[in-house]
Amino acid sequence: MKEVSIKIINQNEVAAIFKNRTDYVLKIVEDAFIKWANNEVLLPDKISQIFDQQTQNRINCMPATLLKDKVSGMKWVSVFPANALKSVPNVSGVMLLSEIKTGFPQAVIDGTLCTRMRTAAVGAVAAKYLARHHTRPTPPPAKFE
């Protein structure tokens, strides 16, 4: 029987991997968009379990598969907006990665920091491609009233 070895990567390790590597994070996100546009990604709809309509406390399950890379994964993210009032993070998550030849899990990764980095990078990549060329920021009015 084949032994399954699963790598556990905690938040400190994620931070160390990506420390001072903003360009790398942007490239990963940009490459993911390109792969999706080229139909190299299976990206089912997000499953959202909302526990309380008033608070919007929920857990989201977001699966995806990179076909050419032969890896499938799922991000499990809890969103509890009122946590901010308790001085605890309102978003936390974990990711599970499996290879798709045998389906064996390969890694469990703390997804909280990954979620933050991805969210920021999506905005930056969108700005790169959607901003008008040769534009400058509008200066503030000379006088505020």
Question: Model segments located where?
Answer:
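N-terminal ligand-binding/catalytic initiation module
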Residues: 1-118, 122-124
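Glycine-rich adenosine-cofactor-binding loop
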Residues: 123, 133-145
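Glycine- and Gly-Pro-enriched alpha-helical subdomains that act as flexible
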Residues: 128-131
